[in-house]
């Protein structure tokens, strides 16, 4: 077997979590990431029949039965992932209609997956229906997006348009816009179900007064989605109290649609 720490997807997970911490998105043990892997990817590094222990997931997800995930651990600090990946990350195999997780590697200190695991898995299930190539769900606490939920309407169209108008690339990067949930108790199946429902129509779901969820085909794409939305929110928070002299008009955004071959979410542009 090859050394799992040399796997390209493991290296990228370590780099991404380290970068998220460096950006200030994942203070203390905040934030979590899950990466869907194919069995062929895992088998090069692990005997998939060698189960270290089983963990109850607390939910049912039949469409994810048999899937493999590399996921961050509960109570773990992203700043420590690069130094002790086998403690802060775990590779699991879902069985029993998603009700059981077989631990194949990691969580070496007896830990388990993130407390937001239900929201991650339910979001994976919904995004796979929309895009079979989806592989990543990422949650973090970017300061400006978080701040914006205190001073801006949580109406999804209005929130999306505000972000699109802050930076030319926004409508190109996330033409599907952002969906928004009002404050809900985190770490529950209820917020997991609500997030998954929102994931049906957008890859970015904001949790008001908490953070954001992003989904994508790989770690780079998902990180970039959040990074772009956060930059737009930063600009918004810097200018929201000032008189607005210029903006990106709907007509200009239609030009961006044509130039970059994207389609803005229906009804979001005039």
Pin down the residues of each PLM region.
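Glycine-rich flexible loops
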Residues: 1-270
């Amino acid at each position: 077997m090859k050394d799992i720490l040399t796997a390209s997807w493991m290296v990228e997970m370590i780099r991404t979590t380290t970068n998220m911490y460096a950006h200030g998105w994942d203070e203390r043990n905040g934030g979590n990431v899950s990466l869907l892997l194919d069995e062929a990817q895992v088998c090069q590094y692990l005997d998939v029949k060698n189960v270290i222990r089983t963990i109850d997931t607390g939910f049912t997800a039949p469409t994810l039965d048999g899937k493999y995930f590399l996921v961050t651990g509960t109570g773990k600090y992203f700043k420590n992932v690069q130094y002790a990946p086998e403690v802060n990350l775990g590779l699991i195999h879902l069985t029993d209609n998603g009700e059981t997780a077989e631990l194949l590697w990691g969580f070496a200190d007896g830990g388990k997956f993130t407390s937001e695991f239900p929201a991650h898995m339910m979001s994976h299930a919904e995004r796979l229906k929309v895009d079979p190539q989806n592989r990543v769900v990422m949650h973090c606490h970017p300061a400006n997006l978080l701040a914006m939920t205190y001073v801006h309407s949580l109406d999804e169209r209005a929130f999306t348009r505000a972000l699109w108008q802050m930076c030319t690339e926004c409508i190109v990067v996330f033409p599907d816009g952002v969906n928004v949930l009002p404050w809900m108790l985190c770490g529950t199946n209820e917020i997991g179900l609500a997030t998954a429902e929102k994931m049906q129509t957008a890859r970015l779901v904001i949790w008001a007064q908490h953070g954001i969820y992003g989904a994508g085909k790989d770690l780079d794409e998902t990180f970039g989605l959040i990074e772009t939305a956060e930059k737009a929110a930063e600009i918004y928070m810097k200018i929201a109290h000032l008189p607005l002299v210029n903006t990106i008009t709907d007509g200009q955004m239609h030009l961006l649609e044509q130039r970059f071959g994207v389609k803005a979410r229906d009804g979001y542009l005039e």
